Curated annotation (Swiss-Prot):
Its cofactor is FAD. NCBIfam families: gid_trmFO (TIGR00137), PRK05335.1 (NF003739). GO terms for biological process: tRNA methylation; tRNA wobble uridine modification. One of its GO terms (molecular function) is tRNA (uracil(54)-C5)-methyltransferase activity, 5,10-methylenetetrahydrofolate-dependent. InterPro entries: FAD/NAD-bd_sf (IPR036188), MnmG-rel (IPR002218), MnmG_N (IPR040131), TrmFO (IPR004417). The gene is trmFO2. Its EC number is 2.1.1.74. Belongs to the MnmG family. TrmFO subfamily. This is Methylenetetrahydrofolate--tRNA-(uracil-5-)-methyltransferase TrmFO 2.
């Protein structure tokens, strides 16, 4: 049996999930977090597991890969999923949270755990002889980044993503905007929709692509590497005049109450438990703040919008996981060092959490002399870990949960006449069922 103390660097989603999982297995944890000493440009709260991009953990539906992933994590006793359900706010078929309540719940659970020692400190040195889980996230400090570079022998791991603005609900003009979920999913209408005619859209588009961008703190636009899942809306727009119509401004399933179709729709999603703040869905941005006020006020219904937070751009880091980590997210060159979270190349809140969860289970097995295990790729959890272990070394790109990375299944079409959409739904239901069964088998063996 090895030393039953683990250093965890970073009290974000992956780090807190891992700390909880190790502590419940009676393993002592030293959890290092720097934010109470100095915050990065997008952090606001003092608590752990702060959500700095969207407040949504995305779909809860089992026919969706990330919905199935959440169910897998429930079966694995995920602290993060429990916190999200505690802090949940209405969001149709999605799991969205009040950021403050969510962080407070996790901070309390971690801080009160007798097996976890929280240390407010910027880690400047990593002891290669101590068991360490690096879960420093996509905003790793420069000093820690230098240490990681020494460990992996490579400093080519960076990208940028962006944060969407938040506005006050009472400043939204509900004579123009209307409440509706896409295709009327869910029991309540949780999204506020701002419709646009073709003329309004083209005027908005023209201003957006010509707006001033805040680049003073960036090394040059040519060097930017954006996450597809959190791309600035202005960068997306520059791909073509219709690009936004198939992205954050997609009008399908969002007709006006009288049935009239829109050329484009901007959606707003509840951001707090008190239903006072709404974020502009998919509108992560790096525009200068006066430009955000000017251009986003062109959106019908937001002409008098009061912005409580403007969008900002921030640097994120990830490593070349297929090159430097084994399938247990353990450093190939040092068995004492593990990684988890977005720094490994999983993209998304829930994905980060599950990497911390599974890695913690394997660290516990490693300490206790048991065989380390990874869930089958029939599960979403296993498929994610399999992806970051076996993806291209020369062009590794972060990945969200999706059915495309899960093992293919044999699916027989029903004899009766069904639509393509019905077939897709039935197939996804079957994949989800097998994924959940796979996790149940994994649990039996750990």
């Amino acid at each position: 049996m090895k030393n039953k103390t683990v250093n965890i660097i970073g009290a974000g989603l992956a780090g807190t999930e891992a700390a909880y999982q190790l502590a419940k297995r009676n393993i002592k944890v030293k959890l290092f977090e720097v934010k109470r000493i100095t915050k990065n440009p997008v952090q606001v709260l003092d608590g752990f597991a702060e959500l700095v991009c969207s407040n949504s953990l995305r779909s809860n539906e089992l026919t969706n890969a990330v919905g199935t992933l959440k169910e897998e994590m429930r079966l694995l006793d995920s602290l993060i999923i429990r916190a999200a359900e505690y802090a949940q706010v209405p969001a149709g078929g999605s799991l969205a949270v009040d950021r403050v309540l969510f962080s407070e719940y996790i901070t309390k659970e971690i801080s009160s755990n007798e097996n976890i020692e929280v240390i407010d400190l910027e880690v400047e040195n990593i002891n290669p002889n101590e068991l360490t889980l690096i879960a420093s996230g996509p905003l790793t400090t420069n000093k820690l980044q230098e240490q990681i570079t020494k460990l992996i022998g490579n400093d080519d791991f960076y990208f940028y993503d962006a944060v969407a603005p938040i506005i006050e609900k009472e400043s939204i003009n509900m004579e123009i905007a209307y409440q509706k979920n896409r295709y009327d999913k869910g029991e309540t209408s949780d999204y506020i929709n701002c419709p646009m005619s073709k003329e309004e859209y083209l005027n908005f588009y023209k201003e957006l692509i010509n707006a001033e961008i805040s680049i003073g703190h960036l090394p040059g636009e040519a060097e930017l590497k954006y996450f597809e899942g959190c791309m600035p809306v202005e960068a997306m727009a520059k791909r073509g005049v219709d690009t936004l119509l198939f992205g954050p401004m997609k009008p399908r399933g969002l007709n006006k109450p009288d049935g009239t179709r829109n050329h484009a729709v901007v959606q707003l999603r509840q951001d707090d438990a008190n239903d006072r703040l709404y974020n502009i869905v998919g509108f992560q941005t790096n525009l200068k703040w006066p430009e955000q006020k000017r251009i986003f006020s062109m959106i019908p219904g937001l002409e008098n919008a009061k912005f409580v937070r403007y969008g900002v751009m921030h640097k994120n880091n990830f490593i070349n996981s297929p090159k430097v980590l084994n399938k247990y997210l353990q450093l190939k060159t040092n068995e004492n060092i593990f990684f988890a979270g977005q720094i490994t190349g999983v993209e998304g809140y829930v994905e980060s959490c599950v990497s911390g969860l599974i890695t913690a289970i394997n660290i516990a097995n490693f300490i206790n002399g048991k065989e380390m295990q990874v869930p089958s790729s029939k599960s979403v959890s296993g498929a994610l870990l399999n992806y970051i272990n076996k993806a291209s070394i020369t062009n590794f790109q972060p990945m969200k949960a999706n059915w495309g990375i899960v093992d293919e299944i044999e699916f027989k079409r029903p004899n009766r006449k069904v639509t393509k959409q019905e077939i897709k739904k039935m197939k996804n239901e079957k994949i989800s069922e097998l994924a959940i069964d796979s996790i149940k088998d994994f649990i039996k063996n750990i």
